[in-house]
Structures are given as C-alpha cells and as structure tokens.
Amino acid sequence: MPAVCESLLDDIEDMVSATDPKPHDRQSARKNIVPRARKRNKNNIQEEEPPADSTIPGTQKIWIRTWGCSHNNSDGEYMAGQLAAYGYSITEQPEKADLWLLNSCTVKSPAEDHFRNSIKKAQEANKKVVVSGCVPQAQPRQDYMKGLSIIGVQQIDRVVEVVEETIKGHSVRLLGQKKDNGKRLGGARLDLPKIRKNPLIEIISINTGCLNACTYCKTKHARGELASYPVEELVDRATQSFQEGVCEIWLTSEDTGAYGRDIGTDLPTLLWKLVEVIPEGAMLRLGMTNPPYILEHLEEMAKILNHPRVYAFLHIPVQSASDSVLMDMKREYCIADFKRVVDFLKERVPGITIATDIICGFPGETDEDFKETLKLVEEYKFPSLFINQFYPRPGTPAAKMEQVLAHVKKRRTKELSQLFHSYDPYDHKIGQKQQVLVTEESFDSQYYVAHNRFYEQVLVPKDPDFMGKMVEVKIFEAGKHFMKGQPVQDSYIYTPSITKPLAKGEVSGLTEELKPPNNIPKSETLLEKHWERLQVFLFLTALLAAVIAFVGTKLV
C-alpha cells in the first residue's frame, strides 16, 4: 500500500501533457501579453483633487464693530492689532469683509439690540461671525448666538486662534478668566499689538471689574470682581505709547477709583508714577470713578488734577439724588457723599469739569425722588450730563423689582433733558484765550477737535499743522456741548516732545523684527507675504503631481 501511494503521488506531481508548451515557450509567449488597464473614472479623480479656492486663514478681510465704553474700545483696538500683525486685513467696509468681529456692550438694551441685529445682518450676507465683549460673556447661551464663536473679555489675546478656527468652519468659545496662582488677573497683556482708532490717543484699561454690586448692572456679570494691572506694567504701556507718537492718554475701567485695592496699592500712587513719564505738551485724562473710593483720596486727587499735564476733569456718576433710590441701587454712598466730593474738588481745582450720569425711572423711584434729582442738576448745572432711561437687564435684581410705568420713565427723561438744555455752561468763556490740544477731526469734517485744560471741547480751523499740537486760541462762540476758537495770531504752536505718531491703521507694539520696512506700504507687504505662501502651495502641488505620474508609469 505505501508503495502504491508513493507511485500515485509521483505520477500526479510529474504528470505533463505532451501538448503542453515547454517552459521556454511559455516565457516567450508572456512577453507578447498586454495587460488590460482598468478604466479610471475621471469624475472621481476630479472630486478627490483639492478645490481651487481652498481657505487659507490669515489672508481674509475682517470688519470690526465695537459698541460701548472706552474699555471695550481698547479691547477692540487690541484685537484689531493682533489680527493685522498675523496678516489679516482690517477693513472699514463691512460689505467687503469675509468675517465680522462684533464687540458688544451690555449696559443698555438698545446697544444689545444693535448687536443682535448686526449678527442677523452678517448671517444674511453669508459672512463668518465672531462675537466678543460683555454680552456673550454675561449670557453666552442666548439663542441668537447659537453656533457662533465667542471671545471672552479676558481672552482677547487669543483672537487670532478664534478667527482662524471660525474661518475653517468651526465654532470656538473661550470664556475663561485669567489667573496667576489662583489670583485673578486684570486681563490680557498690555503689550499686545494694537491698532489705535486715533493714533494720537491711547486708551489704557488700568483694571477690570469692580467692588460694587449695583442692582441694575449687567456689566458686573461680564467683567466680574476687581482685578488691577501692576503699576509698572501700566507705566511701561504709557511710556511705549508716547514713544509711538501718542499725545493723549485715557485711563479707563469700570471704576478707576477702586484701582489697586486688590494688589495693595491705590489710584493716586499710579497717577503720580504716570505723570513722571508724560512728556511736555501731552495730556492724561482720568476715567469714571464712583464716589465711595474717591472720598479717601480727595487731597491727593486734587493735587493730581491740578497738574499741568492732567486734565482737570472727573467723571463721577451720581445716578440719583434720592438716598432711598441709591439704597435700592446698592450704590454704597448717599447724596451727601457725592456733594462732598464735588464741592471739595470744585474748591481745590478751580474750573474743574465734573461729568455725571443719571438714571430716570429706576424701579421704585417716586415723583419726590425724581424732584431731588432735578434739584441737584439745577444746583450744580453739570456741563456734561449723561441721561439714561432705565432699562431692566436680564438676570439683575432690578429687573425683578416693581417697574416704573413706561410713560412715566419717558416723561422724567424728557423733563431732565429739558432742564439740562436750559442752561449754557460755556457762554462766560467767550473772549477767553485758552491752550488746547488738537487730537481729531469733527464728525462733519468741518473742524478739528481740541480740548482745553478742563477737557472742554473746542472746535478749531482745519490746519494740518495743528494736529497733535498745543495751540493757543481765542474763544469766539459757545454752544451747549462745545466752543469755537480762533488761533491767536503769532502764537506759538507747541509740539509735544514725542516722536511722530503712527499712521492710521498701523500696528502698535510690534518689535523691530516684526515690523515691515518703512518704505514698503502695508498692502505691498501683505501681498508679498501671500505670494510667498502661494509659491509654497504651487511647489507642493507640482511635487505631488510628479509623484503621481511616476507611480502611474510603474503601474503600467
């Protein structure tokens, strides 16, 4: 049996037909065989290729719209600077922009309405949208912001990341607070690139948040508790600004008077350090401060406001002259405290301008309460008065209080406005000679806008030699909100001891390594940058095509 099996296996392995071709013949025949190539689907090949208009972040045009306070405007300038430094083009024409960056304000309902309408308009125009500011920070779950990218008020240093991801089609939300070892910081760094709306004016936020808990305020929900920047960082920022040709600095925050209480310093200490670096011919303007925190420093504040390079101007919101209303607002002062601050400063700083705010129709305000407010305005005749009809903001205690009827709020707002327009604060200054600092153009483009020692607005003729300079003028006309001045003949036009200002739209804060050469226009520099990117893209595309062709020949 085994022998039979072995014989069978040998026969099977060795079995060859007499008609089979020999191995040599098979090899020769193989050379004449042409393999059939599988037909390619041209449509599929085209679909696999990258689209010709691939989106490359950093090449788009961006339109930025900011609502609200000077703090918010400073944030908008920082975001514009970072985007421009990265390569994006900042445009003032929304219809030409690829992306709209909407920087919102939550103080009053009308401002939020404008913000919401702008989002809708952007979406209808098929624009990419990024939102920032106090509205999304305080209430990010609003239905009209679903699917939108959000930059929190303390995350503006990451605007490039958010815009880049949004352009790619992603939705990004950065709403966190900045902390150092658990301690809250003032916000993004002060030395970030920036595009000043006015190259002559630098807005510096000295702190964010506040120590109060006003029952009507929605901003507190967004900006949070007080967090101050160190004195050294603020002085460095001011110094850098003057080196870039700025001739006027605005100090801003939700409450400048509270500055430093969280880091062991105070506002007068900061101000004395700042005046040391203000060049001759440049000026500093102090922003809004609430009465409680200025009371402790009245003597020092009076000395500082008398300094020749500090405007004799202070914005102190009173909101109401009724103690019962102030208590419901949780303003933490009484009307006597406010009067003490104003009276002291008017006595120690002759001619000082006191600006204030008043809310008409706060919940629970009676006719008697409102009459107290009218008496206060009649007594002090504030030259600058911001009158606001009360709007309940969602999530605030005041929104849950019993509301004053709408027609009553409107009547009180109108009555206070009529009182304000019944007196002329500047008529007595006609004929005076004043030194004014010229910083901008009027809205109607007919005049240059300047401010005198008391930060009162003076319109002067449009002489290019005046811009950014101290000019002596004689007042010949006065209106409700301004005066008009004629330059005094043969008077000396004083040029501040600072460098030439940056061009409009030029990025502040860039190191020399990052700055383009001065003789190359910005648009030219951006074009070269984009052309370099395009060259790299074309090279990689050609290389890929060569590889595909080589592989194809091998397959054949």
Curated annotation (Swiss-Prot):
GO terms for cellular component: endoplasmic reticulum; endoplasmic reticulum membrane. It is found in: Endoplasmic reticulum membrane. One of its GO terms (biological process) is tRNA methylthiolation. Its EC number is 2.8.4.5. Residues 427-489 form the TRAM domain. Gene3D superfamilies: Methylthiotransferase, N-terminal domain, tm_1862 like domain. Residues 60-168 form the MTTase N-terminal domain. It is an enzyme of class 2 (transferase). It holds the Pfam family UPF0004. Binds 2 [4Fe-4S] clusters. One cluster is coordinated with 3 cysteines and an exchangeable S-adenosyl-L-methionine. It is a single-pass membrane protein. Its cofactor is [4Fe-4S] cluster. [4Fe-4S] cluster 2 binds at C210, C214, C217. [4Fe-4S] cluster 1 binds at C69, C105, C134. Residues 17-57 are annotated as: Disordered. It comes from the Eukaryota. It catalyses: N(6)-L-threonylcarbamoyladenosine(37) in tRNA + (sulfur carrier)-SH + AH2 + 2 S-adenosyl-L-methionine = 2-methylsulfanyl-N(6)-L-threonylcarbamoyladenosine(37) in tRNA + (sulfur carrier)-H + 5'-deoxyadenosine + L-methionine + A + S-adenosyl-L-homocysteine + 2 H(+). Residues 196-427 form the Radical SAM core domain. Keywords: 4Fe-4S, Endoplasmic reticulum, Iron, Iron-sulfur, Membrane, Metal-binding, S-adenosyl-L-methionine, Transferase, Transmembrane, Transmembrane helix, tRNA processing. Belongs to the methylthiotransferase family. CDKAL1 subfamily. This is Threonylcarbamoyladenosine tRNA methylthiotransferase. It comes from Xenopus laevis.
